[in-house]
């Protein structure tokens, strides 16, 4: 199957159609930028400034520490951190040591964490002191061998580093003297063992850099194997698309979580490669973000619709100057047209929608920032990327405006799923990645999402898998049947709703089910609404009609 690539005629002259295939490691971009911009600020974190030389030095210290403690090439290291300097240092440090970074969400429950770490066969976990109880549980279960603990205060400037412990609501005591193989990040940084570091030989095309966990139709998380070449190719595509910038001179607002592959590529790797300053925020708070933009003047602001909506709806918006922002690439969920228009009016910059998935490192499409863009569209394929609409009915590529499954091809497409050859074969066919998203392409090569083939709920930029939520709630003794679906939400795009049938004579209310769900699921996966029914709509063979429930919900939403 070969597409005609009509989108190339729409490319601005500054964007190349094809890019050279990168044949170097991911960590080489840090080495290169540290050589070009040694004294330039790479990270700004609540007043703390770290240069590119600082980041490289600390990453090499961590790499040496990991090797001295037994890490071998290909060993998996879980990085369970919010956006902070240690996240960046850990990422490149693990890569310098020859390890594989396992992206781990700090919001995971112990149950979710255990599954991922067992599946990836992780040997080391790097995490916050506040998350130590989860980490030590994994060590007690013999899932991980070593724990590396850090604190937000480790990279705060004086006097914030002194005051921070006093403001913590949660106090965690860690006895480092009596517990073997538990180390502090700070002590690691004090050791001068970089001369002991042996940089392993890496094959960028085949060696895995990152295991990025994602779900599927079954809800069972799978490790997406992303090679050095996969991620670096996507980073270079990002640089080519965002061409109207000056290397070493931009500031990027780092709110999108780096444990999400979008933040990893479009913020962290992109900024490191081009010598940009990253202004890091561990979590999104609308007022704090407005203050940061007003004070630090970021020029680039990758995000998700919920972030932009949160800023636009804040009552104090008019008191802050957002005019420094030149361009924003929105991902993770559909960007409402009115949000795009209002945000561009407030900032004077450009806000465009893109599209991607973990299996593609992640970006495959975006609207042109300095060129034609179509509100409601996910845009055109990036350089060196092919895309098409596949018709299941004909087994051929669909014509313009014909609906089908979006398929993509390019150097950013994953190597496969970790230890799951059958699932890999199901989505990688004849060189194409079958995304599971349904849509169409217009005559100019702009693509549109029409529906989610997988019943994934995208709420606030997070992917939530109904089956996973259903299975967690099915453990409640009062539940007979349950189906979870994404329903319209003006802020999050979609939100999680559970339709429940209780066992005869059993009793349970919303509060009880909510508490039960919170004990088993990360907060963003917990249903925000419950509807109790006597029965659920089903087919003749007993399959629950999720689509029927969604249609009813959509009708009710429109009526409201």
Curated annotation (Swiss-Prot):
Top enzyme class: ligase
Top-level taxon: Bacteria
PROSITE patterns the UniProt entry points to: AMP_BINDING
Gene Ontology molecular function: any one: ATP binding
Gene3D superfamilies: 3.30.300.30, 3.40.50.980, Luciferase, Domain 3
UniProt xrefs under CDD domains: FC-FACS_FadD_like
Sorted UniProt keywords: ATP-binding, Fatty acid metabolism, Ligase, Lipid metabolism, Nucleotide-binding
Catalytic activity: a long-chain fatty acid + ATP + CoA = a long-chain fatty acyl-CoA + AMP + diphosphate
Keyword Nucleotide-binding on entry: yes
EC number: 6.2.1.3
Homology family: Belongs to the ATP-dependent AMP-binding enzyme family.
Protein name per UniProt: Long-chain-fatty-acid--CoA ligase
This protein's encoding gene: lcfA
